[in-house]
């Protein structure tokens, strides 16, 4: 059977190489549908994956990549989903890992400008959420999708996936936010750092929040030696202090406060930086949610503050051209505030 499938794929690849994209696309759909009707899902998967790869590599000429995207989506909808293929996430789930690997490899074949890529990502994540242990989707697939968007400088789409990704996603997200920040005013560093930190806090991933902050601030300090970064040490903590960037210090202190679980310190911290936080204008919902989530501080609110905040601040939106733009709510003031008064670290 494998030899027969290999021959089928080879014939269709020859058609694709000769420019007969539409003919190859239609024949691959028919052949795959025949295997699906026979419940021979493995054969259908090989046919669709092989054909999709060849068409995607042919590029956008005469709709080749669109045809490849169609076959990739068919692979998820008509094979993975209909077959009920699942992933357990365990070390012994070799089949699940192989199925994810096939999807990730296909994803990387999509040209960045191919419109069907977004639909493929949605279907891929949806399948993993339905047939995997995590309803919001598999972390490795989220990381793959977020990384692709990050490489293509599509930060809003990248953020939505990287925040639900793996431990590696924190570094990818922090680097993305830092590169984005370098196109903005120097005093806006905390705005971009918060986009790498707050989403992880809101999904309960304190480890990734700390990692993202460390990566961002390390790049900031190494690229801007004139910042005059101060290292402050105590019996239990080592903290970088940025005298000219108070809100960056706020984020650093916030992470320490969450680790200690001190509601009183959280209230003290937010009160101390209240004027700067008000000036930012987009952190209120996030901080209210963090206060409730980590310190049981309930604040009366209407609607769903988590979804509202993510939609309006962290995950933003795009202009009609799909290009990057400045995060909403960025302060236009270029005033560099005075360094904060010392706070107890122990």
From Swiss-Prot:
* Known function: Component of the get4/get5/sgt2 sorting complex involved in the GET (guided entry of TA proteins) pathway that leads to the insertion of tail-anchored (TA) proteins into the endoplasmic reticulum. Get4 and get5 form an obligate complex that catalyzes the transfer of tail-anchored proteins destined to the endoplasmic reticulum from sgt2 to the cytosolic targeting factor which then targets the TA protein to the ER membrane via get1/get2.
- Protein species of origin: Aspergillus fumigatus (strain ATCC MYA-4609 / CBS 101355 / FGSC A1100 / Af293) (Neosartorya fumigata)
Keyword check for Cell membrane, yes or no. Answer: no
> For this UniProt entry, what is the primary localization, expressed as one broad class?
cytoplasm
Indicate, by first and last residue, each region the UniProt record lists as having compositional bias (Polar residues): 321-335
Instruction: Name the gene behind this protein.
Output: get4
Q: Which InterPro entries match?
A: GET4 (IPR007317), TPR-like_helical_dom_sf (IPR011990)
Q: Where in the cell is it found?
A: Cytoplasm
What GO CC terms are in its UniProt record? cytosol; TRC complex
**Region Disordered, residue ranges:** 317-346
- Similarity section: Belongs to the GET4 family.
Q: What is this protein called?
A: Golgi to ER traffic protein 4
